[in-house]
Amino acid sequence: MKPFSPSQTNFEKEQLCFGVYQLKDCYQQVIEALSLGIRVIDSAITYRNEKECEQAIQDFCHQNVNIKREDITLITKIPDSLQGFERTWKAVEQSLRRTGRPKLDVVLIHSPKWPVRRIESWRALLQHQKEGRINKIGVSNYNIHHLEEIISLGLPLPAINQVEFSAFNNRPTFLSYCFNHGILVQAFSPLTRGYRLSDIRLLDLSLKYNKTPANILLRYCLQKGVSPIFKASSFVHIHENVKAEQFMLDPSDMDVMDTWDEEFVSKPTWNPIILP
């Protein structure tokens, strides 16, 4: 069964998110994702497409007057190279200029790489938020001990934590911790970068529900209270992935999928959640 998850606002609930890392035609893909009901776009400073994403969102809202800009969330992230109070402070200002927005929707710290700098960066984001330049702030690739560090300093916890999560790496203890502290969990690589899409157990469920393996994995995340971030390079794939919101997995199948956990990491050379 799906555990408790925070849902105070439309953004703070589990939903499909569209990732724009290395998209060749970012602007058009974002337009197409929005047209299919996606309302969270996941970008980052290192992706170099914040401006394209914001322009696509603005144009979509202009063409669809019933959709307001505040109905859509654009996430960006502070890279390791810009950690530290001053660098993070300036990075936020630069993102504001790139997007032309008076206030950023969501800003995350991309990883906990630098022990001292990550706290300085967190303080910078808190101050920007206090002064009205950011709506919500969060982190990415933070494990429980990284979050405990924030608590030990008497600082507010992040609203969002974006980590690798899938049926093959379902982090039960971590998930419970985040939910108990009111932290929304977003999943990158929920489709395991394709490495587990041919798993026979997954294919069996795909056949049972008449859905793609990707649909099954995305649906699993949603029913765990996690917001999966998927990437697709064509309208057809975006349309196919959105179908994950149109069905439910039986509780018994969810329980079975819970047993698939093997702590699978799709990119072992970059796994910052294990950093001290």
Swiss-Prot record:
CDD domains, alphabetized: AKR_AKR1-5-like
Q: Provide the Gene Ontology terms for cellular component.
A: cytosol; nucleus
> Site positions for Lowers pKa of active site Tyr, renumbered to this chain?
77
**Gene Ontology biological process terms from the UniProt entry:** arabinose catabolic process
State the disulfide connectivity: none
Enzyme Commission identifier(s): 1.-.-.-
Q: Which Gene3D superfamilies match?
A: NADP-dependent oxidoreductase domain
Q: Where in the cell is it found?
A: Cytoplasm; Nucleus
Q: What keywords sit in the KW lines?
A: Cytoplasm, Nucleus, Oxidoreductase
Q: Active site: which residues?
A: 47
The top EC class is oxidoreductase
Give an example GO molecular function: aldose reductase (NADPH) activity
What SUPFAM superfamilies does this protein map onto?
A: NAD(P)-linked oxidoreductase (SSF51430)
- Tell me the InterPro entries matching this sequence: AKR, NADP_OxRdtase_dom, NADP_OxRdtase_dom_sf
| Annotated binding of substrate, by residue | 110
- Where does this chain mainly localize? cytoplasm
Q: Which residues form a coiled coil?
A: none
Similarity comment text for this entry: Belongs to the aldo/keto reductase family.
Name by which UniProt lists this protein: Uncharacterized oxidoreductase C28F2.05
Q: Which organism is it from?
A: Schizosaccharomyces pombe (strain 972 / ATCC 24843)
